[in-house]
């Protein structure tokens, strides 16, 4: 793939004394691993551009799993993330690195990612609605199809006041037992609309996406979540990540 592509750096690490190993998310090729030769040298013009949350145009090539970066241009300055929104951005970057296979095209997801980063950059309140929408979009692109609006058992539309439990490969069925794996019809409608007007629907969305993403993430904890707990105030951590 030698043409220019829109891209974002998800993660980078040193690779030899003068080069970087990049994990990037591109519009056409999906997630790609690149070597940026000379990017760490003092004279490199790429060093400042190859950072997370900077919209890029990249050109790369090669036949192996690890491609070689040919050229890179920053489309604009990095989107301004700091504090909670920075850790939120690191979280979705790590999420993509953990669940996406290399060189699988996800063009629509690329724009979902861009929209999420833009929403985080412009957030004046909690970043959680943007995170939940992105997680739901990611699940959809991974093939995790869920019907939030109908009871799988009866075929009837979900009722706001009833409780439902999710069964894999079946959907939501009515439940008389209420626990952390059940959802009200009102919460399911909010998930379907991807609109979370209050704390109740936001908490429900977080419960569902964590449950749904768990098989993709396995038992390995997310580093971004641990960093958030380590560096942000305890009250903030509990509000946004517990």
UniProtKB/Swiss-Prot annotation:
BP GO annotations: DNA recombination; double-strand break repair
Coiled coil: none
GO cellular component: bacterial nucleoid
Alphabetically ordered keywords of this record: DNA damage, DNA recombination, DNA repair
Record flagged with keyword DNA damage: yes
Taxonomy, superkingdom: Bacteria
Entry similarity comment: Belongs to the RecO family.
NCBIfam families the record matches: reco (TIGR00613)
Quaternary context: Monomer.
Function: Involved in DNA repair and RecF pathway recombination.
Name of the protein described by the UniProt record: DNA repair protein RecO
Organismal lineage: Bacteria, Pseudomonadati, Pseudomonadota, Gammaproteobacteria, Enterobacterales
Gene that encodes it: recO
